[in-house]
């Protein structure tokens, strides 16, 4: 009798090299275990006292951050179930800017508690149904827990209520300086609502960040206009402020056009050689004179600037700035109202832009060029100049500012101004309300609903752990503060009890109104929605089929042992 070797199921269906994992092999438990590893990594980075991670990506770049979306984007994750959560955090980052850690941690905790339900015998379908019922109930309860609303979106003090908690979750200790910078920059570009109830248009691209090494964070400033981290090319470094100046933007090189193929020129005598160079000079001189005759006083070049062209531009008193980034060119065109030109020549009046002033400033040891374009009190763009000791720290501060600016974008949505209690107070209140809802639900679905409520405990527990508090004391005190109403207190006073990360009280509980710690309703709703959908998506998968990767054999990553020229 011949020996029968075991074969992979569906071996004749797919090409050689595929992998298949089904629930019979315990794939859902393995997927939850893989997600748990990532969940534990992001857990310690949540909250104002969250720890940073040093990540070296595949290009060798060093990133220091505690933002979940940034960490997951730089990591080379290959597990397909984990990638579902990575996409969820990316969606939260794109739409809301803040709450990425909440999405990752809540989705991971929902899957952690679902593992217990699976071991009890509940099917994935029942867990998904219970989670969806609890999610709908949670979103309704959040509307009833609103404790404030930002009505005047042009008021800096009102904006600080929303910007400060977002930035403090990333850069705790520097939130006062950074939130002031962001609110000032936003107030420069945010148009005033013409009538009551009108939502002003806000573009996150209107806030730019320029990082300059040296100094400290307290030396950071906000400038109305656009700042480039380089100085003009020629002798003209600044333009006066007494009038508006015409600006021409070119995406082509400011130089003599060269042929794509090589050519040979035969010169018989010295006069022919002189005439050859004179023709080039006359051609460039004529082009620059045409531009100067149009009244252009500033040229922004997206490519190289030739020495001969620069000589004639200096003669005509035209300021020349080289901006290699096409994205910066696009923003500058929007600020000045100019049209980028792909050809070298005199622009038409419609293609020219206007700028109020262009000047060169020295900040630290660097020379920067400032383009100011103001319309009364409102500018089309505003730039935050950041100062710091290390490039990694400046990059992390820039990410915190981006989150604060994105929060302002969420504020401009129809229901974006509503605020919820922060510091874990909302989650503690949701636990009791969802648990009571689960007790009223008949059947096995109540088990999934109650576990959905248990998952929210991860937020206050993590805030207390990262702050160095005793979780076994803080959590019972929080539950007691939300369930006991003091005599003479307002009915909603218990909603304001959150985690005291500073440890000022013995109980570890504080009134969040003292520090104005609030969360945005729109951000919280979106995060709970995305996290629940990601968790239910992973639970609904019963089989993972992975095809063989395309491409040939890869070179080994590490160095070969022995001498480099040794033959095999």
UniProtKB/Swiss-Prot annotation:
Pfam families: Cpn60_TCP1. GO terms for cellular component: chaperonin-containing T-complex; cytoplasm. The keyword Chaperone applies. Keywords: ATP-binding, Chaperone, Cytoplasm, Isopeptide bond, Nucleotide-binding, Phosphoprotein, Ubl conjugation. The modification Phosphoserine is found at residue 505. Signal peptide: none annotated. Transmembrane segments: none annotated. The keyword Ubl conjugation applies. Its main location: cytoplasm. GO terms for molecular function: ATP binding; ATP hydrolysis activity; ATP-dependent protein folding chaperone; unfolded protein binding. GO terms for biological process: chaperone mediated protein folding independent of cofactor; protein folding. InterPro entries: Chap_CCT_theta (IPR012721), Chaperone_TCP-1 (IPR017998), Chaperonin_TCP-1_CS (IPR002194), Cpn60/GroEL/TCP-1 (IPR002423), GroEL-like_apical_dom_sf (IPR027409), GROEL-like_equatorial_sf (IPR027413), TCP-1-like_intermed_sf (IPR027410). There is a cross-link at residue 15 (Glycyl lysine isopeptide (Lys-Gly) (interchain with G-Cter in ubiquitin)). Gene3D superfamilies: GroEL, GroEL-like equatorial domain, TCP-1-like chaperonin intermediate domain. It is found in: Cytoplasm. Belongs to the TCP-1 chaperonin family. Heterooligomeric complex of about 850 to 900 kDa that forms two stacked rings, 12 to 16 nm in diameter. Molecular chaperone; assists the folding of proteins upon ATP hydrolysis. Known to play a role, in vitro, in the folding of actin and tubulin. In yeast may play a role in mitotic spindle formation. This is T-complex protein 1 subunit theta. It comes from Saccharomyces cerevisiae (strain ATCC 204508 / S288c) (Baker's yeast).
